[in-house]
């Protein structure tokens, strides 16, 4: 029972990272007066490009760079349509979402023949997790050991720590 709850909390911390980062991006966009419903499309495009580039180069860092580039590209498309051409921001965002959904599905099927899914990366090509000191030793301590081992230690420092440290700035 207790370990199941910790596993759920652990998964919640990991899975919340992209949603929290997108929400923070939406908050910053709204504060600047830009309506950006295209965050889902940017996330989808970034995830697909990151997985594809990481698969081709066997480097998670190159995949991250690819995701950053596609996110900037989609944002520039939105800015061009909304600011330069004075189009409706909501329509531009919906177009980005539809474009990203269609493009990732078609390219994923054409390139990988896996129903739109990208291949798994080998463990050495992924971001490594950070094991905090004494995590294994403290695992035997009731309740606190499990919390330290399962919930705090063993996460990817790039994702979880960055997200939870920058959240108060919004």
Where in the sequence are the language-model features?
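Extracellular/periplasmic helix-loop junction at the C-terminal end of a transmembrane helix
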Residues: 101-147
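Interfacial loop-to-helix junctions that mark the boundaries of transmembrane helices
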Residues: 6-10, 147-158
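Conserved small/polar residues in nucleotide/adenosyl-binding loops
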Residues: 163-169
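Membrane-interfacial amphipathic/re-entrant helices at transmembrane-helix boundaries
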Residues: 1-22, 35, 49, 56-62
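Transmembrane helix-loop junction
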Residues: 27-31, 51, 55, 79, ...
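Short, non-helical or kinked segments that cap or interrupt transmembrane helices
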Residues: 30-46, 83-96
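Alpha-helical transmembrane segments in multi-pass membrane proteins
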Residues: 14, 18-22, 42, 46, ...
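Alpha-helical transmembrane segments within multi-pass membrane transporters and channels
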Residues: 58-103
